[in-house]
């Protein structure tokens, strides 16, 4: 997983509430277990018409927002069914930070596991930041200092210390497990010695 320290980008503002995971990445694209290639299908039904052509009015089809790394979204973002493909699609598109006033719990957790920073802010702060999307001006995210910098102002945000550490160091579930590899091996060896009947090891 890529480390997340800081980020500067023109944000894309998508002021739609209750965007669920099926809207983020529809079910017909969930057959793959690869994390790459999903970005082109992000927000598929909002980005494309029935003939597969891009809908020009959609924010992520417009320059420079089609290169945005920061998505400002409506409340309750990522609700609906649990699918890790949702953060995969965002990440593959290039979005590594989402800003909203609220998230579905599972989606929120999945973001951290895949290197995406989900920031929670009050609605009035969301509106303030959305102006930078409209004006096509950059904002900056500083995870270490837990702040968003825009113009001559800044907004502080809160994040769980452990989740922050994982993003800063690029630690996903596999990396966290491997960090305790020696302890896991020792535990397995002790268990095998104390309760050998549990194991069916013919070697």
Swiss-Prot record:
Enzyme class (EC, first level): lyase
Protein's pathway: Amino-acid biosynthesis; L-leucine biosynthesis; L-leucine from 3-methyl-2-oxobutanoate: step 2/4
Keyword terms, alphabetized: Amino-acid biosynthesis, Branched-chain amino acid biosynthesis, Leucine biosynthesis, Lyase
Gene Ontology cellular component annotations, sorted alphabetically: 3-isopropylmalate dehydratase complex
One Gene Ontology molecular-function label: 3-isopropylmalate dehydratase activity
Catalytic activity: (2R,3S)-3-isopropylmalate = (2S)-2-isopropylmalate
Gene Ontology biological-process entries: L-leucine biosynthetic process
InterPro entries per the UniProt record, alphabetical: 3-IsopropMal_deHydase_ssu, Aconitase/3IPM_dehydase_swvl, AconitaseA/IPMdHydase_ssu_swvl, IPMI_Swivel, LeuD
Assigned EC number: 4.2.1.33
Similarity annotation: Belongs to the LeuD family. LeuD type 1 subfamily.
Functional note: Catalyzes the isomerization between 2-isopropylmalate and 3-isopropylmalate, via the formation of 2-isopropylmaleate.
Subunit structure: Heterodimer of LeuC and LeuD.
UniProt cross-references to HAMAP family, sorted A to Z: LeuD_type1
Protein name: 3-isopropylmalate dehydratase small subunit
Protein's organism: Pelagibacter ubique (strain HTCC1062)
Lineage of the species this protein comes from: Bacteria, Pseudomonadati, Pseudomonadota, Alphaproteobacteria, Candidatus Pelagibacterales
């Amino acid at each position: 997983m890529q480390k997340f320290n800081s980020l500067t980008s023109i944000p894309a503002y998508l002021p739609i509430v209750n965007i669920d995971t099926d809207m983020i990445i529809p079910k017909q694209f969930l057959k793959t277990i690869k994390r790459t290639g999903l970005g082109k299908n992000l927000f598929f039904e909002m980005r494309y018409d029935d003939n597969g052509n891009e809908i020009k009015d959609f924010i992520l089809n417009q320059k420079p927002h089609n290169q945005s790394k920061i998505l400002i979204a409506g409340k309750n973002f990522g609700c609906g069914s649990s699918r890790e493909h949702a953060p995969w699609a965002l990440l593959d598109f290039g979005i590594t930070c989402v800003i909203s006033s609220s998230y579905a719990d599972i989606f929120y957790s999945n973001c951290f596991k895949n290197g995406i920073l989900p920031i929670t802010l009050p609605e009035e702060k969301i509106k303030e930041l959305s102006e930078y999307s409209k004006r096509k001006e950059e904002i900056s995210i500083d995870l270490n200092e837990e702040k968003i910098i825009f113009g001559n102002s800044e907004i502080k945000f809160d994040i769980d210390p452990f989740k922050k550490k994982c993003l800063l160091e690029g630690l996903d579930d596999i990396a966290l497990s491997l960090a305790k590899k020696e302890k896991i091996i020792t535990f397995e060896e002790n268990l095998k010695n104390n309760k050998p009947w549990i194991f069916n090891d013919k070697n």
